[in-house]
Amino acid sequence: MKRELLKLSILEAHRCLKNKDFSARELTEAYIGAVEQDTLNAFVTTTPELALAAADRTDGLLQRGEPIHPMSGIPVGVKDLFCTKGVRTTACSNILKNFVPTYESTVSQKLWDSGAVMLGKLNMDEFAMGSSNTYSCFGPVKNPWKGTEGKDLTPGGSSGGSSAAVAGLLCAGALGSDTGGSVRQPAALCGVVGAKPTYGRCSRWGMIAYASSLDQAGVLARTVEDAAVMLNAICGYDQKDSTSSQEAVPDFLGGISRDVRGVRIGIPKEYELPKNRGDIAAMWDQNIKHLLDCGAEIVEISLPHTTYALPVYYILASSEASSNLARYDGIRYGTRVEGETIDEMYELTRSLNFGEEVKRRMLIGAYTLSSGYRRAYYDKAQRVRCLVIRDFEEAFKKVDCILALTTPVEATGIEEPLSAMDRYFTDVFTVPASLAGLPAISVPAGLSERKLPMALQVIGNYHDECGMLNLAAVIYEHSGGVLQHLHGF
């Protein structure tokens, strides 16, 4: 019985709770049991007492016959980048390993206000810098998928704990963050749905900053409808975030009609499929044919400056990171290493407690912001970013949504030696939408020859999450998802 509860989607569990097929406490206990047996290293902090208390509140509402939100009583995990009041929040870095916030992030508070149940905090790449979830002070996360080779694989990153937990049936949904693809890429590698809304739709207040002009909260779930429900719960204006959008938030779930007749889908000619990959080409062709059969129109578009998106992203993100992470010095909070002078204390605290990838990106950022090189790198990157945005604006005059691969590769082995450049390249299809602040979603679309998930990415126009989700739902319905191949449902 408990195993069957774990297989339910958020909306299925919601219907069962309303029908009193089981209680929120029973559902939560099933997930707590699964988390206790976690072999993926997905959770870094667990909160079973808080979870059961939240479940009991939902059961109380049901017993009194009061209406409940679709997220009420639903067990979820929270990426360890979001501050949770009274619960350790580390960004998976030694420099914050004992930090306990005194306040709650806006997006997690919105989840709790909807009645969601927090199972705990999820592993991630340190300070969200990475695409493999191997850069964590708590150790790497394992992908639930093994493929034909049967070896331990990375779940992607930086929200690797979130994607692995959802795919591994350790939570019904999860909060993640997406700076350059950190929700969509791990969702693709783990065979789940990962969505980021338009920049500003979700408050960044209480989310530990990596690159402030790019950071955006997102969600990971098993179905597109579940992602829509979670997005509705966390989106909305917040006066505590100066970049928060005041655009009204529509009913994302209600916008999913699966009618794509006349919808113009743009295919960027610059987004080439990987060569010598017949399985990816076949998956792509099958989905294009299905969309045409459903009445959609396929339009070739050009995004000429996306060729430069990846280097532009790493210049800008690293520059912002070097500024944002300057605050971690061991003085007011976080880990401190004593030295004979204050300068020595700063040096020891930061050099011994930041991981190698974080230090690499901070050094890149310090270099690109330095007086002798800022104009050549940072200022030029900002100008190219404007050109990338202009490309998308021109494209959306011709199309309603844009379709692309989420990532050019499947999950790689945890022990597989990859250079930093190889890892950066996994974000090549996700970074452009982040630079432009556009909503985007990754949808599982089939299995590769290695029996690993492949995914498509739908990019929507600004504040058109409904159109994006509707097209994604059609793609998901065609593939049927992929988790049934992993769990037998």
UniProtKB/Swiss-Prot annotation:
Gene Ontology molecular-function annotations: ATP binding; glutaminyl-tRNA synthase (glutamine-hydrolyzing) activity
Keywords: ATP-binding, Ligase, Nucleotide-binding, Protein biosynthesis
Highest taxon in the source lineage: Bacteria
Catalytic activity field: L-glutamyl-tRNA(Gln) + L-glutamine + ATP + H2O = L-glutaminyl-tRNA(Gln) + L-glutamate + ADP + phosphate + H(+)
EC number in record: 6.3.5.7
A Gene Ontology term for the protein's cellular component: glutamyl-tRNA(Gln) amidotransferase complex
GO terms under biological process: translation
InterPro entries: Amidase, Amidase_CS, Amidase_dom, AS_sf, GatA
Broad class of enzyme this protein falls into: ligase
Active site: K79, S158, S182
Entries under Gene3D superfamilies matching the protein: Amidase signature (AS) domain
PROSITE patterns, sorted: AMIDASES
Annotated signal peptide: none
HAMAP family, A to Z: GatA (MF_00120)
Family of this protein: Belongs to the amidase family. GatA subfamily.
Role, per record: Allows the formation of correctly charged Gln-tRNA(Gln) through the transamidation of misacylated Glu-tRNA(Gln) in organisms which lack glutaminyl-tRNA synthetase. The reaction takes place in the presence of glutamine and ATP through an activated gamma-phospho-Glu-tRNA(Gln).
PANTHER family associated with the record: GLUTAMYL-TRNA(GLN) AMIDOTRANSFERASE SUBUNIT A, TRANSAMIDASE
Summary of subunit composition and partner proteins: Heterotrimer of A, B and C subunits.
Protein name: Glutamyl-tRNA(Gln) amidotransferase subunit A
Species annotation: Anaplasma marginale (strain Florida)
